[in-house]
Amino acid sequence: MTVRKNQALLTADEKRRLVAALLELKRNGRYDEFVTTHNAFIIGDTDNGERTGHRSPSFLPWHRRFLLEFERALQEVDASVALPYWDWTADRSIRSSLWAPDFLGGTGRSLDGRVMDGPFAASSGNWTVNVRVDGRTYLRRSLGAAVRELPTRAEVESVLAMPTYDMAPWNSASDGFRNHLEGWRGVNLHNRVHVWVGGQMATGMSPNDPVFWLHHAYVDKLWADWQRRHPGSGYVPVAGTPNVVDLDDTMKPWNDVRPADLLDHTAHYTFDAA
């Protein structure tokens, strides 16, 4: 059984193995396929049209499946690897070990945002950004520049306390847990972290930055935490809702999995802590 650990607790060997697996997926082309898929859904998901990966109830199960697919790809390279999660309420500084040269590397230089250290820096020669919005082929970050503070634990707790998963109009204007976690309403959790990191993380091509996977692993954990606190509150909508994914509808691009199939993460992995 895969155990997803807090990235702050990874051993040096676990970090090394994860980095090596990421670099291999990049080398063999599979990594960029995930970037392309994510960007297609960012572009296609709209408040008034069909929406699957974002701005909709299926934001959480869609990303759960997306991360599962990516984690399995990593494990085909190295079976010992699991996706760690980044608890940004605790590791909220640009000096956190997450950003060290032996792991993800740090922020970008002020001139152009280019990441200059770590295994994913352009100078390593191993991380050319191929799926991109412009001619810049290097990983970019501007940690804490566009928004100064990452979400706090108190802000997370305020969202975890919300008793209803989602509600009409089932988009970025909705009240409820999903939309507050996604970040279109209220304290802005998930979206704010993308903006705090900056660079490619602030675009539809956000998986170009490996921190995407650690960020979304934590968002996924928060969904699991919410489920445990609200066992009587399930995924909604259940049926007959235009433009969104109901409980038993299949989700694109896989077309073989429903939100109902992804409500229990323990069939696939557990977390190191509640």
Model-derived segments and spans:
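C-terminal accessory segments of proteins
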Residues: M1-A274
